From Swiss-Prot:
Residues annotated with Pyrrolidone carboxylic acid modification: Q1
Stated name of the protein: Sulfakinin-1
Function description: Myotropic peptide.
Cellular component annotations (GO), alphabetically ordered: extracellular region
Chief location bin: secreted
Gene source species: Rhodnius prolixus (Triatomid bug)
Entry annotated with the keyword Endoplasmic reticulum: no
């Protein structure tokens, strides 16, 4: 899943 920054979120 990607957060509002476009980085991986676990």
């Amino acid at each position: 899943q990607f957060n509002e920054y476009g980085h991986m979120r676990f």
